[in-house]
Amino acid sequence: MTGTGRTVTRVDLCEAVYQKVGLSRTESSAFVELVLKEITDCLEKGETVKLSSFGSFLVRQKGQRIGRNPKTGTEVPISPRRVMVFKPSAILKQRINANGSAPSMSSSASAVDDDKSESASRT
């Protein structure tokens, strides 16, 4: 399940459980489906699902607002609705930034400190 820009599917998750846990493919599939169903059921009830070191799934209520039809420019009321939000944990953010192309906060902060010390030594 490694690679960039690739979409991981249920089948991929089931295969990972099969490979790493040692359950049969049928049991792995049932396990993944059970976990996803439990998360879905909790979110339907408006509960927050917090997975330590991963993040939280939560449902937020959005109020009614006025939008615009992009074709006509006419104002259109947008009904209130519930939306699902994912908030990644600090640990997940660090792991993503450590493996990604963007510099981490600590390395960019140290680069700023290095620049300050270099300019101070020149004066």
From Swiss-Prot:
CDD domains attached to this UniProt entry: IHF_A (cd13835)
Quaternary structure annotation from Swiss-Prot or TrEMBL: Heterodimer of an alpha and a beta chain.
Record's keyword terms, sorted: DNA recombination, DNA-binding, Transcription, Transcription regulation, Translation regulation
UniProt-annotated stretches for the region Disordered: 97-123
GO molecular function terms listed in the Swiss-Prot or TrEMBL record: DNA binding; structural constituent of chromatin
SUPFAM superfamilies: IHF-like DNA-binding proteins (SSF47729)
Biased composition (Low complexity): 98-111
Cross-referenced InterPro entries: Hist_DNA-bd, Histone-like_DNA-bd_CS, IHF-like_DNA-bd_dom_sf, IHF_alpha
Protein name (Swiss-Prot/TrEMBL): Integration host factor subunit alpha
Protein family (similarity comment): Belongs to the bacterial histone-like protein family.
GO terms under biological process: DNA recombination; positive regulation of metabolic process; regulation of DNA-templated transcription; regulation of translation
Role summary: This protein is one of the two subunits of integration host factor, a specific DNA-binding protein that functions in genetic recombination as well as in transcriptional and translational control.
Top-level lineage group: Bacteria
Composition bias, Basic and acidic residues: 113-123
Cellular component terms (Gene Ontology): cytosol
